[in-house]
Amino acid sequence: MRGRPWLLCLLILAGCGQQSPPPDTLVVAQVAEPRSLDPQVTTALNDFRILVNVYEGLVRYRPGTLEPAPGLATSWTVSEDGLSYTFQLKPGVRFHDGSPFDAEAVRFNFERMLYPDHPYHGTGPFPLAFFFEQIAAVEVLDPLRIRFVLSEPFAPFLSNLAYPTGLLVSPTAVRRWGQGYGRHPSGTGPFRFVDWRADERVQLGRFDGYHGEPARIDRLIFRPVTDPMTRVAELMAGGVDLALELSPDNVAAFRDRDGFQVLERTGPHLWFLILNCREGPFADPRVRRAASLAIDRDALLHSVLRDTAVAAAGPIPRAFAWAADPGLAPDPHDPERARSLLAEAGIGDDTELRLLVPRGGSGMLAPLAMATAIQADLASVGLHARIESFEWNSYLAQVNDGLAGRADLAAMAWMTNDPDTLPYLALRCAASPEQGGFNSGYYCNPAVDTLIEEARQATDRAIRAQHYRSLARLVEADAPWIVIGSWRQNLVARARVAGLRLEPSFFLYLDGATKQR
């Protein structure tokens, strides 16, 4: 075990006097203050971890998988042409404010999200429209049956319903609070909203009127603790019961420390470098491949990330086992081959690059440490990258506007709910920043576009899988990204906390959590 992180923690702890939470309360150290508790507004995993304890959707992910399973809908049928989905709703369900959950409430939610003329529309940004843009109509058949009519077959529809964007809010509460609803949420989940003290906490309480198995603990408190070392100190001092997204060094140290438990699980996450395919050295695919061969992925995963991530290849995370190509492997570390390709492309050993990297951010692992290691690997073959780092929101503004005229490569991470999401948003020719997409490197291969569209519309999973594997092989051959790995999400808790589980969705369900007295 390395001592340095613990020395820092002990120095911090010398000034800590946090009172331990009571036995009926679970305190979670989050990475940031939530933006909103309205599922039609927020897009951050940090906020999702709170939302999934307050709300439910028609569909949820089956525990331990990314497979759609019944939620507030007990069953559903799909028309033969894939254009109509009819859901049977669970009877007797009420929102936390006492209003009934029924088909009219479902229609209100989706019309609020999709229709610009809805009186409570305009609550949030992309990706809300993307997830459900194929909905042409929402029809109430009776109080417990609702039908969605789509404009075209859309295979990810059920998976998107299970995502937090599909969580259902109380129409009564929305009408009462209007644009302020995000700070006064009301769902149907096992916990109800109690209060939100800015920069201090969000508090939830067990909902005694819950329609399912009641939560096993009385209260949840989510505290924003932005500094990871402070999260460690709070955990050590007993001020919090569990902490999320600790540094690789601290996770490694906690694995062997008595009195604590470490939960880790790989999910649908990718960390990669976006390459500027429009201009500069990386417009040549040989240079892109050379850069990939220059990077020592094993050293990044084991030495820098301390095994908090696993190797990945291609644009489809391996968490989607049915869609990912098991034969696709990362490039080996081969500096000699990299130098040969660079010479073939006429690239000298004094080539300068601009590498953009955030100082932090959801799913970004250890971006500065990774960038420094990558910088050294690239320099070993004559590619000299100048690192420029930014605060997360400033970084997104830079990268999402496109790399042309700004940089040669940039670090990025995505967590997705379906194999469709990342290719559609970030690899299509029509997904350039100028067109509202996230293809910041301007990669374009019409054959990939065709496969993305065919996969979206194929309702037969085996056919979808064939399309995803074909497009993954094309993308890997073109090398518009250098894919490094998939994050093993981590949670460190005190040993007295039981009933915790990590899901491949990265969501944190706490209704089964308990604390030993």
Language-model features: where?
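Extracytoplasmic/peripheral linker and loop segments enriched in polar/acidic and small residues
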Residues: 17, 380-397, 424-494, 517
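Aromatic- and charge-enriched surface segment that lines or borders ligand/interaction sites
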Residues: 74-120, 147, 234, 281-283
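Structural transition elements
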Residues: 311-345, 361-369
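Long beta-strand-rich cores associated with HINT superfamily self-processing modules
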Residues: 491-517
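N-terminal lobe/hinge region of extracytoplasmic solute-binding protein
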Residues: 30-80, 111, 118, 184-188
